């Protein structure tokens, strides 16, 4: 069994994690996931009741997503107004040992919460606080939790889509399907996160660095489903690639992509997705559609992608969703407008990462580009309905990945 909680901007990430755990064969209790504006937010007592149900075993998996510090978390009711409604690490330790039992022994816990993985030495606390100085990492280790994955810094999300820490933890949940150990699952979740980025931002590197694994990396998680022989880390096409020799381009593999584009309307504006995949989310930039194609080729290494043809249409008067990384509450996040620059500057990117099956390469395509207007924050969203591209390959021994710089281009009319 598994328990997933969340509220405010973490609710969509919690729902994504719950759905992926369910797909992996787990029975998931999602009753503590509160959508923004819920009329009955869950309390600290409700969470403790779910973690330590009377007469029943503690869930084997728990993703308790909330606002944290290193030794307490805020309930959904606390987030809604009662700031005193906390669950402390000391309370959890007491419940875990009640009646001489070890109710958290062998469990797997992970969270999107801020500083939930910050291990603070007891000597730093001192004084009267020394007796209750135990942080989450220390407390859960003493309770014999097998695995605890949490952030040493701020957990970061987005109010309009599943992004940053939310997305990483959802990927981790997906890989807890019995095909990998708990340590491998986090390793490959981070790899898959990086491999799916059309553009890498500082917040991406931050969340990858601070998501910390405590416990036994070789611990395995069993599920109710038939264990897969391999674990799929990323949603992408995986057709075999056979590069051919072009007299001008050398080894190349041509592709034509016709993404299915879907408009999403939110309180913050509009954005599009491609092929039902998560969009490209980059801090302080308009959210863009994104789709991914595996371009892994045996014995060859992709060095870049060359766009050869485009078919597009424009949507005018669009107020885009401009990504503002959220660390506190959705309401406290500043409102950001788009500027008059076009984003993204490049719509195709080759990523190289490690999957459970070995080295993987993907063509990450962002079939959209927004050009803003500074006076009211609206602008033109260009959407690419058809994209022709060639992925260029070299031998693995070739270490030159520097793209050529085009300083000038001229056009000539047809004769």
Where are these regions (language model features)?
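Cysteine-dependent hydrolase recognition
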Residues: 1-415
């Amino acid at each position: 069994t598994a328990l997933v909680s969340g509220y405010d901007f973490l609710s969509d990430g919690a729902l994504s994690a719950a759905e992926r755990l369910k797909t992996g064969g787990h029975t998931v209790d999602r009753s503590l996931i509160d959508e923004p504006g819920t009329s009955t937010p869950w309390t600290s007592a409700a969470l403790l009741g779910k973690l330590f149900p009377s007469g029943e075993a503690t869930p084997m998996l728990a993703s308790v997503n909330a606002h944290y510090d290193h030794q307490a978390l805020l309930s959904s009711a606390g987030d809604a107004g009662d700031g005193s409604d906390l669950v402390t690490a000391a309370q959890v330790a007491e419940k875990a040992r009640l009646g001489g039992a070890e109710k958290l022994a062998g469990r797997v816990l992970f969270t999107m919460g801020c500083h939930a993985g910050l291990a603070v030495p007891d000597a730093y606390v001192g004084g009267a606080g020394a007796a209750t100085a135990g942080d989450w990492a220390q407390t859960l280790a003493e309770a014999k939790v097998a695995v605890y994955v949490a952030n040493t810094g701020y957990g970061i999300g987005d109010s309009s889509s599943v992004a940053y820490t939310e997305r990483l933890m959802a990927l981790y949940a997906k890989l807890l399907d019995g095909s990998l150990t708990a340590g491998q699952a986090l390793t490959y979740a981070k790899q898959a996160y990086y491999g799916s980025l059309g553009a890498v931002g500082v917040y991406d590197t931050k969340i990858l660095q601070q998501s910390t694994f405590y416990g036994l990396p070789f611990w395995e998680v069993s599920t109710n489903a038939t264990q897969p022989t391999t674990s799929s880390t990323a949603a992408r096409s995986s057709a075999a690639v056979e590069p051919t020799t072009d007299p001008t381009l050398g080894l190349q593999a041509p592709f034509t992509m016709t993404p299915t584009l879907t408009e999403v309307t939110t309180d913050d504006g509009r954005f599009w997705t491609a092929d039902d995949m998560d969009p490209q989310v980059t801090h302080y930039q308009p959210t863009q559609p994104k789709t991914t194609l595996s371009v892994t080729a045996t014995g060859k290494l992709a060095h870049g992608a060359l766009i050869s043809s485009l078919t597009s249409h424009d949507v005018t008067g669009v107020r885009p969703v401009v990504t503002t990384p959220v660390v506190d509450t959705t309401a406290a996040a500043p409102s950001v407008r788009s500027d008059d620059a076009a984003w993204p500057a490049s719509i195709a990117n080759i990523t190289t990462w490690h999957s459970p099956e070995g080295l993987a390469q993907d063509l990450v395509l962002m079939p959209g580009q927004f050009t803003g207007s500074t006076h009211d924050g609206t602008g033109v969203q260009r959407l690419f309905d058809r994209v022709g591209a060639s992925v260029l390959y070299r031998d693995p021994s070739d270490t030159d990945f520097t793209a050529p710089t085009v300083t000038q281009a001229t056009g000539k009319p047809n004769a």
